[in-house]
Design a protein with these regions (language model features):
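Alpha-helical transmembrane segments of multi-pass integral membrane proteins
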Residues: 105, 213, 218, 241-358
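Acidic/histidine-rich catalytic neighborhood
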Residues: 219-223
Length: 371
């Protein structure tokens, strides 16, 4: 297979998605005065919109793997299922299992050698088989903080396996199956919004996120095929593009008002996935736009190490909180909002940079053998 297309601007959008996720976790405090302050409540409230970073990652990953598969079919006439799964494993597994196994070793050491009380962890098989999102639905998130993040990787892995077989054996129905995923997701979300309302299911269940993946793959299909719809939206001028971003920002400002309506909750993920789908097309294919995120070396750098940023920032937060409690460090609203997030971000960036250069890169070089 020849060199696959590289979307420079999309790398940078990964950094922006991480900032969303980071904002949901970075404002930490155990001081009642800080927690009850109006400023903290306001900032932390909007920070909870960080889940949209994950929504974007779902759409983007589906777009990229589908695009690569279509390229592969065009160049070779077939899709290498085994090679695809190996490539995905080489990218996802090293950091993932490093964190999982380290966490479990630390857990047993702390519990049985230090005799320190610590919440029980899920059965490790939930992580090994990438089904911890289902565990979380039933049991909640009251376990080691930085392991909780891995539920989204479970969903990604489940989709990779499912989608690889679709790409291998049902490729000619790709468009229809993508649309079907969106419909299934909407029906699923409707059922768990009205018939059997369970918030954890709406958030953590794989079926609830199928719309994200369906839209991502559909965007790849219409872009590669250069459909009329693609030609229209990929040539949006500045004003039309600005209108999309205004809709997005407005939805964030009034999020709690808009999505307090149960009917709109059904369409929440699809709504944002469509906006993210537009951003992907705009950044990947519209050469006339004035704002191209890939022009920022800083965003491109952070985008390159974004997987590490996502996986490691929870560990840094965990140690920060532990340190604050261990040394009884006094807190105030300014340290919580400015100092601690800055320390967390800088530390996470340094760890992720060296992880990418000296750990992940070894595995990434192996990926080239499987194209």
């Amino acid at each position: 297979m020849t060199q696959k297309k590289y979307f420079k601007n999309l790398d940078a959008t990964r950094a922006l998605a991480f900032f969303f996720v980071f904002s949901a976790h970075a404002f930490v405090s155990s001081d009642p005065t800080v927690l009850n302050s109006s400023l903290f409540k306001s900032i932390n409230g909007y920070g909870k919109l960080g889940f949209l970073g994950l929504e974007y990652f779902f759409v983007l990953s589906s777009f990229l793997i589908t695009w690569i598969a279509i390229e592969e079919y065009k160049q070779n006439g077939y899709f290498k299922l085994k090679a695809f799964l190996i490539r995905r494993s080489l990218r996802v597994w090293p950091i993932y299992f490093l964190i999982v196994f380290t966490a479990y070793l630390a857990f047993y050491f702390i519990k049985y050698f230090i005799n320190y009380e610590i919440n029980e962890l899920p059965n490790i098989l939930n992580f090994i088989f990438f089904i911890v999102n289902f565990y979380t639905i039933d049991n909640g998130t009251n376990y080691l903080f930085f392991l909780v993040f891995l539920w989204s990787i479970s969903i990604e892995e489940q989709f990779y396996i499912f989608w690889s077989f679709i790409l291998k054996y049902c490729f000619k129905y790709l468009k229809h199956i993508s649309l079907l995923l969106i419909v299934i997701s909407l029906i699923f979300r409707w059922y768990y919004s009205f018939i059997e309302p369970i918030n954890n299911v709406l958030y953590f269940h794989t079926f609830s996120a199928l719309g994200n993946f369906g839209i991502g793959s559909l965007i790849a299909y219409i872009s590669f095929k250069r459909t009329i719809f693609y030609e229209y939206i990929s040539t949006f001028n500045t004003y039309k593009s600005l209108a999309v971003y205004i809709i997005f920002i407005t939805s964030l400002i009034f999020y709690s008002d808009i999505f307090s309506n149960s009917y709109l909750v059904v369409f929440e993920r699809v709504f944002y996935s469509l906006i993210f789908g537009y951003i992907i097309i705009e950044q990947a294919f519209n050469q006339t736009i004035k704002i191209q995120f890939g022009k920022s070396k800083y965003l491109s750098f952070l985008g390159k190490i974004s997987y590490g940023l996502y996986c490691y920032h929870g560990i840094v937060i965990t140690f920060l909180v532990y340190g604050l409690n261990l040394f009884s460090i006094s807190e105030n609203i300014y340290s919580t909002i400015f100092l601690y997030p800055l320390v967390i971000f800088i530390t996470t960036t340094i760890i992720s940079k060296y992880s990418y250069e000296y750990f992940e890169s070894w595995f990434l070089r192996k990926k080239k053998k499987f194209y």
